[in-house]
Amino acid sequence: MVERVSGKTHTDDDGAARSSRRATVAKPRAKTATQDKFTKKTIALVYDFDGTLSPKPMQEYAFLPKLGVKAEDFWAECTRVAKAERADPLITYMHLMYKKAKEKGLRVDRKDLVAQGRDVELYQGVESWFGEIERYVKALPGAKGVTVKHYLVSSGLTEIIEGTKIYKHFANVFASEYWFDAYELPFPKRVITDTGKTQYLFRINKGIEDLGESINSHMDEDARPIPFANMVYFGDGETDVPSMALLKKNGGHAIAVHSPLARSDSPSSSRARPLGSPPAGERAAAQNGLKKCMELFAAGRCDFYAPADYRKGSDLFKRTCLLIDRMVADIRVQEERSALG
C-alpha cells in the first residue's frame, strides 16, 4: 500500500521513519494576545533537481542504461513524439519510459525506481550543504528564532528522488509521480511543468502543502507563514524562469547555477572547475549553461549566478549566505516594527 502525505509518497513500512521528518503543515490561525506579534521567521530554500543539484537528468543514471538506450536518442524521441502528438513533453517522457521498458520485457515499479535513486550523481558539496547552511544560520548574529526549510520542486520523478542520499533533508518534495495501480500499469499521477512549479511556491507561501487542499482561496498576505521575500529559488535554465520571475516579482530571490566545467572570466571560477579534460560535448553544454545563467542575470531573473559547487566557501555558498544575511536582517526589521504595535 502506498500512503500519501503532503507532497511526499512512501510505503507503510517506512512510514514511521519518514514521518519524523515530515513537514508539519497547519492552516494559519488568528493571533491571540499570548502569541508573538511577529512569527514569520522561516526561510525557504527551494531547489530544482536536474541540472541544479545533479549534473544530468536523473533518468540517465540508471533507468536508461538499464534499457540500453542512449540518453540523447531517448530525449530526441520524446521531443519528436510530443510534437507529432501535440502532447505535453513531460507526460510524453513518462509514457516512453514505460513503453521502452515494456519493449525490453522489464517491469517498471515503484521499488525499482526508488532503488535507482542510489545511482544518481550529485554535484560536489550537495550532501553536506544542508548541514553547512544550518550551522551558518545558527552562528549568525541576530538569527535567533530563524529556521531554514529546504524544498524540492522538480519535473523529475518523486520515486527516484526518494532513493537519493539527500531526500531526508527536504521538508517536502513536489515532483512528477507515477500511479502504479492504475489498470495495473504505471500511469502519470502528477506532472510538474515549468509553469506548474509556481503552484508549489504558492503552497509553501500559504502553508498549504497537502496536495488534497486547494490553494485558490484568497489568503491575506499577513496570514501567509512563509512570505515570498523569505524564499530563494535555485535553478539552472529556462525551465526555471517562471519560478524565478514569481519570486523576484514578489520580493523573493533566485540563484542560477551552471556546470562547474564552464569557464568564465571570473577569477574565482577556476576554484570550482574540476581537474581533467571532459569530453567536448560536455564542455559545450557547460558553456551553454553558463551563457544561459548570464542571460538570466542580465534579464533580472536572478540575484546571482554561480557554478554548481555546493561546498562551504564556494561562490554559491557565499552568495547564498549573502541572501540569508539580507533575509535575516529584514526579518529583524519587521520584528522590531511589529513590537512597536
Go through each PLM region and give its residues.
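C-terminal cap/substrate-recognition subdomain and adjoining C-terminal extension
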Residues: 118-151, 155-341
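Polybasic, lysine-enriched low-complexity intrinsically disordered terminal tails
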Residues: 1-32
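Generic secretory/membrane-interface signal
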Residues: 6-8, 42-44, 230, 234
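Alpha-helical substrate-recognition element adjacent to the catalytic core
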Residues: 27-182, 300-303
